[in-house]
Amino acid sequence: MIQMQTILDVADNSGAKKLFCIKVLGGSKRKYAGVGDIIVASVREALPNSKVKKGDVVKAVIVRTAKELGRPDGSYIRFDDNSGVVINNQKEPVGTRIFGPVARELRAKKFMKIISLAPEVL
């Protein structure tokens, strides 16, 4: 569960290290974002000579949340951190690698490129 002003880790090699959530997309009064939702974020930390710079405003898709996520079969999944992947306006990842596991719910939200790059889908 991500809301405005949440700090997230970045799970790709776009060069950003920390993101600061500015807005949750999808409705004028939407408060929270879960796995597979898109947010607008500011880059708080970045590596030198990277594709994104500190202070850039980017879009990101949430791939892991520390708040547990209920599945239709009654099971729950929860991760150790809140992480996102920086995406462009065509909903494709800016980086070429994804680090760590991602949730299966991304498949239903049509983020197939992220699913294929991820080392593990839980």
UniProtKB/Swiss-Prot annotation:
Is the keyword Mitochondrion assigned to this protein? no
| SUPFAM superfamilies for the chain | Ribosomal protein L14
InterPro entries from the UniProt entry: Ribosomal_uL14 (IPR000218), Ribosomal_uL14_bac-type (IPR005745), Ribosomal_uL14_CS (IPR019972), Ribosomal_uL14_sf (IPR036853)
Q: Name one GO biological process term.
A: translation
According to the lineage, what is the superkingdom?
Bacteria
The cross-references to PROSITE patterns, in alphabetical order and at most eight, read: RIBOSOMAL_L14
The record's annotation in Pfam families points to:
Ribosomal_L14
Q: Which SMART domains match?
A: Ribosomal_L14 (SM01374)
Q: Which GO terms describe its molecular function?
A: large ribosomal subunit rRNA binding; structural constituent of ribosome
One GO term describing the cellular component: cytosolic large ribosomal subunit
Write out the entry's keywords from A to Z.
Ribonucleoprotein, Ribosomal protein, RNA-binding, rRNA-binding
Q: Which family does it belong to?
A: Belongs to the universal ribosomal protein uL14 family.
Q: How does it assemble?
A: Part of the 50S ribosomal subunit. Forms a cluster with proteins L3 and L19. In the 70S ribosome, L14 and L19 interact and together make contacts with the 16S rRNA in bridges B5 and B8.
- HAMAP family in the record: Ribosomal_uL14
Q: What does this protein do?
A: Binds to 23S rRNA. Forms part of two intersubunit bridges in the 70S ribosome.
**This protein is called what?**
Large ribosomal subunit protein uL14
The organism's taxonomic lineage, starting at the top: Bacteria, Pseudomonadati, Thermodesulfobacteriota, Desulfuromonadia, Desulfuromonadales
